[in-house]
Amino acid sequence: MATRPLSPAQFSRRPRFLLRWYYWLLLAVAVAYGLAFAMHWDDRGVLWVQERFESPAERKESVWLPDYHAVIDGKLLPGMEKDEASDLAYNPQTKTLFSVMGKNPFLVELTLQGEVLRKMPLMGWSNPEAVTVMENGLLAIVDEREHLLSIVKVEAETRELHRDAFPKYDLGPSEDQNKAFEAITWDPRNQQLLLGEERPAALFSWKSDGSQTLTGSKQKLVNGELDVRNLSALAIDPRTGHTLALSADSHLLLELDEQGEQVSFMTLLRGFNGLSKTIPRAEGVTIDDAGNIYMVSEPNLFYRFEKQ
């Protein structure tokens, strides 16, 4: 039986159908890419694959962020709704936390449960964005806007701090002057301060013996470029020497080994690691000597994570 040829009407409908299908496919791809970009799946995909290659022994010797679960989830820091929590640091001597507020400059001391113990105005600071605890009651504070690092002394009776009373160090220019040094942590093993530029994310070191005197000048780390959209904060795990690097824009917390290689990560989105809501803008992270992790987010949210 002979095959009946397509009529002109049928022939014209087929290309139009194929064209519509092609446009719908392009739209679906564009939507999927936009969703992946917005949810930062592009950041996490490679990290997840890298995690699969870590051996059980390597996981045991690391912080291993996938095992952490939020036990304090977005607790409000009272009276700080308009102050913009910018960083967080653990003090092993007092077993308390210190946080800097960037919008209205002050230093606050917190319990490990996020209760406020005292607030200390930071007189002379313009935009304090990073803080770390060093030795003997010393804290290093970074003013991002003025590119200055100050090393201050905080004692039990301290009620306010005046920047001009303490040593200051010029951090120099940044590739993006408006997205300069926003992260700092004390590295006691290597006797240095570890500094982080926000964007493009990069790590620097500055030698120190833990006193108010820094040696030489800051040095950019060869392996200090991070594959995140920005760098918000840094912390050093006192047990392993590994670095925690926080990115607010990527909604990620990374664990890096002492060679700067990524070991594990935590995603800061709702439904992951016990979070009931996405952390809106994580700006500070620290870890205590028991391995508990603490974070602050703008405007005034407090988080505590414990290993399960």
Segments (PLM) and residue ranges:
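Sequence/structural signature of beta-propeller domains
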Residues: 2-308
